[in-house]
Amino acid sequence: MSTSFARKSHTFLPKIFFRKMSSSGAKDKPELQFPFLQDEDTVATLHECKTLFILRGLPGSGKSTLARLIVEKYHNGTKMVSADAYKIIPGSRADFSEEYKRLDEDLAGYCRRDIRVLVLDDTNHERERLDQLFEMADQYQYQVVLVEPKTAWRLDCAQLKEKNQWQLSLDDLKKLKPGLEKDFLPLYFGWFLTKKSSETLRKAGQVFLEELGNHKAFKKELRHFISGDEPKEKLDLVSYFGKRPPGVLHCTTKFCDYGKATGAEEYAQQDVVRRSYGKAFKLSISALFVTPKTAGAQVVLNEQELQLWPSDLDKPSSSESLPPGSRAHVTLGCAADVQPVQTGLDLLEILQQVKGGSQGEEVGELPRGKLYSLGKGRWMLSLAKKMEVKAIFTGYYGKGKPVPVHGSRKGGAMQICTII
């Protein structure tokens, strides 16, 4: 063996050995038990999404270790933005306004490049700062996953005083702690479809709207969709449901209103919610439906998914109850001045009618399945073959208000859309 080959072998083998040791060790450490690190289905699914991992925690709590592990796990197509690299000392942002400006410019630059996995490593203890990041995620259509260390000392200021690299005092750490003690709750939790699954379902919904709009049975019922006496022979349903989600589609589980909604904190603290946060699921779509107010897709939840479904969401206006998960849906569009929450209510009314014995009238067969008219302008396409869509369970943390949605690689602003 030549000495040059021996030297190369000697430097190469320890790297492989270290990589195996680090990955196997991670599986055994409770502080590293995150689906996006340990579950290979989740890792594969996240490669199909645009995700902003926002690290939160006190200095020395283990954020940077987690950030490096995420980058190592997803390697290609991953970028980390660390406050440390900008010499930002944890504390008041006002003291580092120029540094944060540069950090945000770099982060936005990666967003414009459609980097699949972005990791932001900072304390992120201030609500105002997080709101800025959530708005950026909305603008570039990134889903957000908040990541907090699970280390035993993460909130122990006495230990953190010895561990943090900035040599912050006990008082400095105690000032940062209040913003990190409570769970940060989203506007709502839900399953967020991958980009490919969103496009597939969105296209299926659009084709259904076009087919329904051209169907002779639908044309006879236009009065439910058109106000006034002016006769009309056809309606463009794609334009009618012009209020559509701009980015990835989603199926809401629990509306939290950032912790203000009834039962929000109890839901977020459930062990199954904590374990499932940031994890991949496969949702089953059984039907597409249209009412004068909304267009949506019915989701059939399996036993695992039902564990994440709140028990109080399937109660229609009448007293007769429906099975758990009945309200599960994906909003595909809303008519003007209609809020997205109406989609689930419309689905409950349809299912309540079916349960009461009124199946509706089968009026024909479309390429994807049988079309039913349920009266009052309500239509359902029962899919002959269920659609399977991939999704990540996480939260939506933005304001749910119109934001300028930016193009990616072309760089221009596209339009102003409402997140629904």
UniProtKB/Swiss-Prot annotation:
It catalyses: a nucleoside 2',3'-cyclic phosphate + H2O = a nucleoside 2'-phosphate + H(+). It comes from the Eukaryota. The gene is Cnp. The modification Phosphoserine is found at S9, S169, S227, S239, S358. The keyword RNA-binding applies. The lineage of its organism: Eukaryota, Metazoa, Chordata, Craniata, Vertebrata. It is found in: Membrane; Melanosome. One of its GO terms (biological process) is regulation of mitochondrial membrane permeability. Keywords: Hydrolase, Lipoprotein, Membrane, Methylation, Phosphoprotein, Prenylation, RNA-binding. The modification Cysteine methyl ester is found at C417. Catalyzes the formation of 2'-nucleotide products from 2',3'-cyclic substrates. May participate in RNA metabolism in the myelinating cell, CNP is the third most abundant protein in central nervous system myelin. Its EC number is 3.1.4.37. It comes from Rattus norvegicus (Rat). One of its GO terms (cellular component) is myelin sheath adaxonal region. Substrate binds at T252, T331. Residues 418-420 form a propeptide. This is 2',3'-cyclic-nucleotide 3'-phosphodiesterase.
